[in-house]
């Protein structure tokens, strides 16, 4: 049997179950990787690796288009989106497509168009992926030197980084254009229960935008997740887009400084580990955003946040009992604290009962009833609107609690409905994926550093027990 290792190897060698599966330049003997090691076989075949990446993009866009059309086909306009297990249509509605006052869906045609556009795009990407995987040149360096690269070429790598940053910057400006010029976006804080509006005055003050980055991530601070108005959201996209574009130009025009050349490992697997770390961070941030934030993820589409559902319950029963003659300002609960209203540690009037721990919740249906010192007793008596009652009653019964078998609500609730909040699905999935990507980062970073240090040489195959065994095939 041919020896499949050398002392200078920096990758593990796997043994094929069936030695007959072989493709030139992609078999185990020439690459050191078995078929199931995927793109590792293509590390030095830039043309084939391009095919794998383009095909992967095609799969992603195909999922988006197919799932989009699936949600459109199943959508019932009479029910809220969050009752229907939808995760893509809420994003489109948040961008202001097909939605009217109060978050009511008035037109599903834009959603259909979005799905079809993604399907068509996926066909183009799929064709490109298959072409480059099977027909196009194995390596790009000879025929198309602009697209060719060597992993160790630090200058070329930072040029590629710069191109990616410019593309990301352009992407960050797309929601800005939508909000400013193309019909606006959905604002859950618009008076009367939310509406689509153009953002005419985005926040460009750097102290306001970068102030979010300097806030604590804990408690009432909430880092960037605490953003509560669309002016700051769109202004943040302007800043991020600009930074990405200028940073991209910088990386294209410059070579890495000496400290950067020393600090980083310059290999394909190292770049993979850096990317996985970034994606892991994105996943954790997205998890917190969709769980806590009801401005970027409006409750009309995603369902209430946990604190919002809890406060909605207190509000709903305050409204009911006030109608029945209860004095909500002075009634005491079983603990001697206020039954409906009490004071927060800093003196504001807040809802009493178990929901006191969520006293700092801000929600569009509740804010009109506040005064300078928290909830305003006279507003609670005279100013509650029917839409506020309807919305809080709806949110009260749709808390983002739920088990895998889709029995939603509090575990002890006898009238539980078949409901799990999209907030639960999206935050849980992004947390789990963020964690797995972090583990992948550690794995690939460790291997890349070991390879760079020259001490990952693999198992010495001369003493490998499997060599004395009968081949499986």
From Swiss-Prot:
Binding site for [CaMn4O5] cluster: 367
Modification type N-acetylthreonine: residues: 15
tRNA-binding in keyword set: no
Propeptide feature ranges: 1-14
Gene Ontology MF terms: chlorophyll binding; electron transporter, transferring electrons within the cyclic electron transport pathway of photosynthesis activity; metal ion binding
Modified residues (Phosphothreonine): 15
Compartment(s) of residence: Plastid, Chloroplast thylakoid membrane
Membrane topology: Multi-pass membrane protein
Transmembrane segments: 69-93, 134-155, 178-200, 255-275, 291-312, 447-471
GO CC terms in record: chloroplast thylakoid membrane; photosystem II
Gene3D superfamilies on file: photosystem ii from thermosynechococcus elongatus
Record's cofactor remark: Binds multiple chlorophylls and provides some of the ligands for the Ca-4Mn-5O cluster of the oxygen-evolving complex. It may also provide a ligand for a Cl- that is required for oxygen evolution. PSII binds additional chlorophylls, carotenoids and specific lipids.
Pfam families xref list: PSII (PF00421)
Keywords: Acetylation, Chlorophyll, Chloroplast, Chromophore, Manganese, Membrane, Metal-binding, Phosphoprotein, Photosynthesis, Photosystem II, Plastid, Thylakoid, Transmembrane, Transmembrane helix
Highest taxon, organism lineage: Eukaryota
Protein family membership: Belongs to the PsbB/PsbC family. PsbC subfamily.
Function: One of the components of the core complex of photosystem II (PSII). It binds chlorophyll and helps catalyze the primary light-induced photochemical processes of PSII. PSII is a light-driven water:plastoquinone oxidoreductase, using light energy to abstract electrons from H(2)O, generating O(2) and a proton gradient subsequently used for ATP formation.
Complexes and interactors: PSII is composed of 1 copy each of membrane proteins PsbA, PsbB, PsbC, PsbD, PsbE, PsbF, PsbH, PsbI, PsbJ, PsbK, PsbL, PsbM, PsbT, PsbX, PsbY, PsbZ, Psb30/Ycf12, at least 3 peripheral proteins of the oxygen-evolving complex and a large number of cofactors. It forms dimeric complexes.
Name listed for the protein in its UniProt record: Photosystem II CP43 reaction center protein
Gene name, Swiss-Prot/TrEMBL: psbC
């Amino acid at each position: 049997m041919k020896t499949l290792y050398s002392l200078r190897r920096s990758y593990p060698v796997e043994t094929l179950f069936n030695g007959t599966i072989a493709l030139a330049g992609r078999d185990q003997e020439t690459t050191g990787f078995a078929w199931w090691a995927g793109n590792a076989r293509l590390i030095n075949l830039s043309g084939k690796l391009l095919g794998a990446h383009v095909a992967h993009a095609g799969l992603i866009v195909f999922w988006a288009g197919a799932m989009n059309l699936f949600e459109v086909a199943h959508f019932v306009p009479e029910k809220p989106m969050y009752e229907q297990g939808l995760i893509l249509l809420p994003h489109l509605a948040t961008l202001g497509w097909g939605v009217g006052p109060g978050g009511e869906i008035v037109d599903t045609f834009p959603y259909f168009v979005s799905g079809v556009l993604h399907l068509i795009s996926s066909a183009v990407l799929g064709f490109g992926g298959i072409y480059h995987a099977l027909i196009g040149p194995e390596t790009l360096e000879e025929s198309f030197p602009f697209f060719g690269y060597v992993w160790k070429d630090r200058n070329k790598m930072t040029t590629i980084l710069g191109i990616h940053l410019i593309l990301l910057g352009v992407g960050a400006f797309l929601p800005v254009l939508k909000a400013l010029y193309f019909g606006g976006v959905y604002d859950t804080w618009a008076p009367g229960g939310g509406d689509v509006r153009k953002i005419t005055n985005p926040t460009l003050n750097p102290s306001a935008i970068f102030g979010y980055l300097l806030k604590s991530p804990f408690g009432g601070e909430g880092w960037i997740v605490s953003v509560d108005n669309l002016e700051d959201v769109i202004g943040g996209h302007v800043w991020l887009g600009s930074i990405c574009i200028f940073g991209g130009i910088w990386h294209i025009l410059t070579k890495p400084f000496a400290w950067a050349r020393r600090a980083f490992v310059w290999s394909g697997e190292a770049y993979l580990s850096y990317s996985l770390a970034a994606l892991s961070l994105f996943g954790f941030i997205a998890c917190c955003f969709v769980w806590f934030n009801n401005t970027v993820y409006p409750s009309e589409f995603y369902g209430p946040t946990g604190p919002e559902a809890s406060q909605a319950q207190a509000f709903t029963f305050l409204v009911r009992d006030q109608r029945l003659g209860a004095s909500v300002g002075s009634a005491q609960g079983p603990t001697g604290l206020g039954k409906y209203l009490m004071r927060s540690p800093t003196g504001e009037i807040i809802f009493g009962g178990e929901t006191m721990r969520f006293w700092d919740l801000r929600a569009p249906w509740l804010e009109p009833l506040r005064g300078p010192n928290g909830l305003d007793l006279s507003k609670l008596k005279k100013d509650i609107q029917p839409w506020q009652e309807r919305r809080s009653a709806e949110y009260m019964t749709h808390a983002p609690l739920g088990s895998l078998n889709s029995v939603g609500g509090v575990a002890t609730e006898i009238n539980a409905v078949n409901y799990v909040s999209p907030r639960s699905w999206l935050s849980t999935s992004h947390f789990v994926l963020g964690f797995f990507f972090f583990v992948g980062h550690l794995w690939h970073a460790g291997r890349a550093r070991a390879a760079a240090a020259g001490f990952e040489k693999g198992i010495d195959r001369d003493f490998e027990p499997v060599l004395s065994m009968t081949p499986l095939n």
